[in-house]
Design a protein with these regions (language model features):
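Short coil/turn motifs at beta-sheet boundaries
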Residues: 168-170
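Beta-strand-loop-alpha-helix segment that lines the small-molecule cofactor/substrate pocket
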Residues: 1-46, 61
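Short hydrophobic/aromatic beta-strand micro-patches
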Residues: 178
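Predominantly a Rossmann-like dinucleotide-binding segment in NAD(P)-dependent oxidoreductases
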Residues: 33-40, 45-156, 164-166, 175, ...
């Protein structure tokens, strides 16, 4: 995205837009410096029926005094059940000839190519992704977060985590987000 903006190209990104808040800030700063460049962040949930149904219920006053939201995903993907016996970074492998590894890495700390960092698996590693929550949180939390105008949480507490270590995120977790009282 940064390279495209610097070269006066319009940018459309899907989640994950960035891996860290700092990376997202840098992207927003770059977009502000190029006001004639169109930038957009997509979330396919904004095109699905549940998004419009929730909005209709909000507009009709059916949803109003919300004090708690429970959101979950119980449909694991192939990359959400990684090998929890990994206790070191994987060794380098032969780089596929059609992959520009340096471009793929972007601003991520350098790692030698390994298939376990690529093709979906990148989601689990701290240096590449954001785990199952980062992968699916945008889908399962976004609609309620937007229409209830929740803003940023003032407290986030990990209540349960399974399948993580010093190298990758949990593949299962229960996290409590506390938000300021709504207006």
């Amino acid at each position: 995205s940064m390279l495209a903006i610097a070269n006066n190209k319009h940018v459309y990104v899907e989640k994950p837009m960035a891996r860290t808040f700092h990376e997202a800030e840098l992207m927003m700063q770059a977009a502000r410096k190029h006001p004639n460049i169109v930038t957009q962040v997509g979330n396919q949930g904004h095109s699905e029926a549940n998004y419009f149904q929730f909005k209709a219920w909000m507009d009709a006053g059916i949803i109003k005094d919300v004090t708690a939201i429970t959101a979950h995903m119980n449909n694991p993907r192939r990359w959400h059940k990684w090998d929890t016996n990994i206790y070191k970074l994987p060794s380098g492998q032969q780089l596929p000839k059609d992959l520009d590894w340096d471009t793929w890495l972007g601003v991520t700390p350098y790692h030698e190519y390994n298939k376990d960092y690529h093709l979906g698996q990148w989601r689990c590693w701290y240096d590449f992704g954001m785990g199952a929550l980062g992968d699916w949180g945008a889908h399962i939390l976004d609609t309620a977060h937007e229409f209830l105008e929740l803003g940023l949480p003032y407290e986030v507490t990990m209540q349960y985590a399974k399948g993580h270590n010093d190298y990758f995120f949990p593949y299962s977790s229960t996290i409590l987000f506390r938000f300021p009282q709504r207006k």
